[in-house]
């Protein structure tokens, strides 16, 4: 919908989300596919949150950050997935201007927060493997809280900068977003005013939020690898590697798919960018609980104990 401004211009009051595809025969199959993905994402992340909360032996810095990671994945997939699913079976795929800006803010908030939460987890593994004697002091509950609040603070700062700059733009005439969610680059393509400031902000904010986490994670794992190679026992070396393997997989999935998506966008291939963004926005949050639970002995033991307790309660009743 487009309303007239005072003067010769017009302003968009709602957007239309183009979605993944405009082929009618694919809408229903895609609806069921992404519904299954979303259900697995919600059940997996919510289950991991509950499992960590209910088991005292998982109340450690490592699982504190994993708790926050699952919370972020649950929230940020819920920012756009319900609307995406509705659009598969709805004829009118519209979203209000306010709704679009809200979705943009929340999506960016949780995505940037995840960057720094993954970074916090890398630092936690560095301290645990390289400075085990100082681990309890270095990763005290107070310090863990400060680190997690800093991650959310960076998310808030980044999303506020992007959304604030987006609010200053005027959208007129064309209101079809070539995406299944309100994201920065597809929205910038619709602006009928200069996007120079936005592009500078994107360059600065994205640069910071890629460089700082990537550099910190890289340095952490360089020290971790050097320390592991100095471990003489094969069993100790294998244990150290297994401690980090799940986190390395999660990092590779998140940063790899995000980099691939934005490279496709920057090359001008919007359609390929949309497809690759599915791995970044949908597949990652679904796989993270599976990666951390299937490869983690403590989580599997906690799950087994919780299931036994639940079975005992149901049998008793």
From Swiss-Prot:
A single GO cellular-component term on record: plasma membrane
TM ranges: 33-53, 60-80, 98-118, 137-157, 200-220, 243-263, 275-294
Coiled-coil intervals, chain numbering: none
Topological domain spans for side Extracellular: 1-32, 81-97, 158-199, 264-274
Bilayer topology: Multi-pass membrane protein
Keywords: Cell membrane, G-protein coupled receptor, Glycoprotein, Membrane, Olfaction, Receptor, Sensory transduction, Transducer, Transmembrane, Transmembrane helix
GO BP terms: G protein-coupled receptor signaling pathway; sensory perception of smell
Subcellular location(s) per record: Cell membrane
Record GO terms (molecular function): G protein-coupled receptor activity; olfactory receptor activity
Residues carrying covalently attached carbohydrate according to the record: 8
Record topological domains on the Cytoplasmic side: 54-59, 119-136, 221-242, 295-317
Chain's role: Odorant receptor.
Similarity remark: Belongs to the G-protein coupled receptor 1 family.
Name recorded for this polypeptide: Olfactory receptor 8B3
